[in-house]
Amino acid sequence: MIDLVPRDGRVIVPRAAYSGTLQLIRERARRGFFTVDEVDVENTVQLVGAVREADVVWIETPTNPTLMTADLEAVCRASAPLDTIVVVDNTFATPLRQRPLELGADVVVHSASKLISGHSDVLLGAVVTRDLPARRTFERRRTRLGATPGVLEAFLATRGLRTLHVRLDRAEANAKELHRRLASDHRVVYARYPGFGTVISFEVVDGHEAAEKVTASSELVIHATSLGGVESTWERRRRHDAEPDAVPDGLIRLSVGIEDVEDIWQDVQQALDVLGR
C-alpha cells in the first residue's frame, strides 16, 4: 500500500486503526515519505472531506480493536472522480460480510491468518485489486522482496477457506448472544459489536487493572493476542505503548470462537466474578 503513495503525498488512516498499521504509516511519515492525517472513520463528513486532499485512504471497517465502522460507499463515491486510491482492510468482515471492491474500493487487504485460515496456524496476508497499475506495483514488490507464501501456508489457508461460511455463521451467532449478555451485565461499562463478525470490544468497571484480572482468570477463553480462530481468545489491548491513544486503556477485545455459547458465557461469567458478583 505504501508503494502506492507518491513522494510527499498524503495518507488518510483511522485514529484507532490496528497498531501495527499505524506504527508503519507513522514511521514512514516521520521519515518524510508522506504526510498522514488520522481521522474518525465514523464521522462521515470529516472522512469524506479528508478524501479530497488524499492520495491514499486506508480504511479499516470495522476498526481493530474499537470496532468503529465507516460509510465505505460514501468514501468510494467521493474518491471516484479523483486519483485517490481507497485501500480497505477487510480482515474483520471477510468477503462473506463485506465486498469493498463492489462498493468502489481499489485495493482490499486481509490478514489471512485470521478468519480466512481460521485455525490459528498460518501466517499469511492477501492483497486483492481491480487496479492494473496497483497490481503491477504489488507484483514487482513480491518478486523483489520474496513476499511469496509457502506451499504449506497456501494449502492451510485454502483448507480454512472451504469452511469459512460454516465457522463464521457459528461464531457470529455466538458473538451476537454474548454481546447481548455482556451489555446487560452490571460489571461491564459498555460492550460494542457492529452487528456482524466475531469480535466484541468491551470495558469493565474499575479500569485497566480490573480488565487484566478478568482476562487472566479465564479457563476456556484463551488469554492471547490472536483472533479469528475456531477458539475464543481475549486480551486487554493497551498493554503496549504502540497501541493508539484512541483505544481505551481498559478495553478488552474478545474474539469469539465456535465453542458452545453456554460454555463461553460460563467462562466469561466466572472470569468477571473476580470483580465481585
Give the role of each language-model region.
Residues 1-187, 192:
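Conserved PLP-enzyme active-site core in the AAT-like
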Residues 19, 26-27, 32, 42, ...:
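PLP-dependent enzyme catalytic core of the Aspartate aminotransferase-like
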Residues 134-135, 164, 207-210, 241, ...:
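Short, acidic Gly/Pro/Ser/Thr-rich loop/turn segments
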Residues 171, 177, 213, 263, ...:
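Long, highly charged amphipathic alpha-helices
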Residues 177-183, 222-223, 262-264:
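Short amphipathic alpha-helical segments with coiled-coil-like heptad repeat character
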Residues 194-252, 256, 270:
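Conserved C-terminal alpha-helix-loop-beta "cap" of PLP-dependent enzymes
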